[in-house]
Amino acid sequence: MIKIAVCGAAGRMGQRLINSVQEAEGVCLSGVLERPAHPLVGQDAGLVAGCGALGVSISDDLNAVIAGCDVLIDFTAPKVSLKNLEACGLQRKSIVIGSTGFTPEERQLAMELTRNISAILAPNMSVGVNVCFKILKDIAATLGDDFDVEIVESHHRMKVDAPSGTAVRMGQVVAEALGRDYDRVANFHREGITGSRTKDEIGMQTIRGGDIVGEHTVYFIGMGERIELSHRAMNRDMFSRGAVRAATWVVGQAPGLYDMQDVLGLK
């Protein structure tokens, strides 16, 4: 039985994670973490998540929660995730990170912090999205430079980073398949007299509003034809189920930083 702890019990993802751990086979909820002095600290995690009393109280003691688990699932923010990753490293415990908005420097630090533990850092835990990453690579490599690429992503009004980590990864996958430098060709701004579209650029458009869970569409636009690859998240359960799947996979893996492509055998 793999013991899973969840970070961020008060959040929407944290609550879905608690439910998904309870529904999965071969795992159990060993601990739930919230920030110090949060009003939910001390309450039963199952009651907070709406799945009935579990006998697991929400804690604000990071080290104690990590000590009691085999793997920690973290959907918070980059700075918090890196702190939790470092704490897991000190206790030789695995971690699954679903936070988005990491800078290149923060990703590099994450790699350095996984010298002694196995960890997963992925912008999207959905199985469907990760299959899309693989499909995008094949489409881009086949079409080559004859098609323009544009990416449109939509999320709820509360999302704090833009573009989404998933959209960025989609752009990186396409750029890699086409032999382009993503940081150079990604275009996030079009306004006024922009001139003609450059051949290499990958456009990135962001929509924020309401309660959209997450939608991504990649357009491959040619002369007289267009291919659209879309993924729409109907709820957060697919993210939480994917995270639990990742947690069961990462325990026992060799030290290093992995992603969902590794979990699903898509590399």
Swiss-Prot record:
Superkingdom of this protein's organism: Bacteria
Q: What is its EC number?
A: 1.17.1.8
Q: Tell me where it resides.
A: Cytoplasm
Q: What class of enzyme is it?
A: oxidoreductase
Q: Which residues bind (S)-2,3,4,5-tetrahydrodipicolinate?
A: 156, 165-166
Which InterPro entries does this chain map to?
A: DapB_C, DapB_N, DapB_N_CS, DHDPR_bac, NAD(P)-bd_dom_sf
Q: Which CDD domains match?
A: DHDPR_N
Identify the metabolic or biological route this protein is part of.
Amino-acid biosynthesis; L-lysine biosynthesis via DAP pathway; (S)-tetrahydrodipicolinate from L-aspartate: step 4/4
Q: Name one GO biological process term.
A: lysine biosynthetic process via diaminopimelate
Q: What is the protein named? A: 4-hydroxy-tetrahydrodipicolinate reductase
Taxonomy of origin reads: Bacteria, Pseudomonadati, Thermodesulfobacteriota, Desulfuromonadia, Desulfuromonadales
Residues that bind NADP(+): 35
Sum up the protein's function in the record's words. Catalyzes the conversion of 4-hydroxy-tetrahydrodipicolinate (HTPA) to tetrahydrodipicolinate.
Active-site residues, Swiss-Prot/TrEMBL: 155 (proton donor/acceptor), 159 (proton donor)
Instruction: Note the Pfam families from the entry.
Output: DapB_C, DapB_N
What keyword terms does UniProt attach to this protein?
A: Amino-acid biosynthesis, Cytoplasm, Diaminopimelate biosynthesis, Lysine biosynthesis, NAD, NADP, Oxidoreductase
